[in-house]
Amino acid sequence: MEDGELIKYFKSQMKGDPNMASAVAAIQTLLEFLKRDKGETIQGLRAHLTKAIETLCAVDSSVAVSSGGELFLRFISLTSLEYSDYSKCKKIMIERGELFLSRISLSRTKIASLCHAFIKDGARILTHAYSRVVLRVLEEAVAAKKRFSVYITESQPDLSGKKMAKALCHLNVPVTVVLDAAVGYIMEKVDLVIVGAEGVVENGGIINKIGTNQMAVCAKAQNKPFYVVAESFKFVRLFPLNQQDVPDKFKYKADTLKSVQAGQDLKEEHPWVDYTSPSLITLLFTDLGVLTPSAVSDELIKLYL
């Protein structure tokens, strides 16, 4: 499977299902790559998969694609030492890949069943940008006949908050779109904050759409619970202590990074994500359970070992 074919397959997966997370599309693409690979050794197969992950990261520079690809590779590679026969080993790797994919496809449902219990009747919720997991949680709350209203930031520069507002209107949920700059003003009106995450880092902090950090700071200042909902395939081996520690490959879009390689100055560009420290987060709802930020490192070690 050539690079061009790999990218085309990845983009077709994304286009075919708008609700599919980019990491899930990447894992489906890697599974298809695994099935079509013509290699004859396990070492060669691993090298080809690693190169395929790098190719996908060059197309979509989000944290989730990087962490999802690495976790997929680790999960299927656990069998490589068990069988000496290559064809048998590859067959088991494909089976494990399909098992991994089926597990992560249930992630949002598990998270929604855990988190919606924290939404009380009459709650006023603040959220940020467009998150498929947050939307799934709110769908579950609607199905449970809970009455609540949502404030959502417009989320510049792509106005993804308006996309979220439109989705919530279809659920007949009262929605108010607010300016990104109005987070501090609106915070006193809300009961809780729920956001998604592009990546969950080793210390229990998160990397998410730009503006998440300021929302967490305001929530902490006004003693409002700040909840994060994220699938476990977004757990990434990264330990940032501040904004500068987040790698540029995650901060900026892939197209922006290519233009920088061509000589353009990165100082003129706005980052797409920021880092929120664990001290600002109340709880994380994942398919592994409800975690405190301090418990994330233990779960991350289990995933990557």
UniProtKB/Swiss-Prot annotation:
Activated by the chemical integrated stress response (ISR) inhibitor ISRIB which stimulates guanine nucleotide exchange factor activity for both phosphorylated and unphosphorylated eIF2. Its main location: cytoplasm. It holds the Pfam family IF-2B. The keyword Acetylation applies. Transmembrane segments: none annotated. The modification N6-acetyllysine is found at residue 35. Keywords: Acetylation, Cytoplasm, Initiation factor, Protein biosynthesis. It comes from the Eukaryota. GO terms for biological process: cytoplasmic translational initiation; oligodendrocyte development; response to amino acid starvation; response to glucose; response to heat; response to peptide hormone; T cell receptor signaling pathway; translation. One of its GO terms (cellular component) is plasma membrane. GO terms for molecular function: GDP binding; GTP binding; guanyl-nucleotide exchange factor activity; identical protein binding; translation initiation factor activity. The keyword Cytoplasm applies. InterPro entries: eIF2B_alpha/beta/delta, elF-2B_alpha_N, IF-2B-related, IF_2B-like_C, NagB/RpiA_transferase-like. It is found in: Cytoplasm, Cytosol. Component of the translation initiation factor 2B (eIF2B) complex which is a heterodecamer of two sets of five different subunits: alpha, beta, gamma, delta and epsilon. Subunits alpha, beta and delta comprise a regulatory subcomplex and subunits epsilon and gamma comprise a catalytic subcomplex. Within the complex, the hexameric regulatory complex resides at the center, with the two heterodimeric catalytic subcomplexes bound on opposite sides. Acts as a component of the translation initiation factor 2B (eIF2B) complex, which catalyzes the exchange of GDP for GTP on eukaryotic initiation factor 2 (eIF2) gamma subunit. Its guanine nucleotide exchange factor activity is repressed when bound to eIF2 complex phosphorylated on the alpha subunit, thereby limiting the amount of methionyl-initiator methionine tRNA available to the ribosome and consequently global translation is repressed. Belongs to the eIF-2B alpha/beta/delta subunits family. This is Translation initiation factor eIF2B subunit alpha. The gene is Eif2b1.
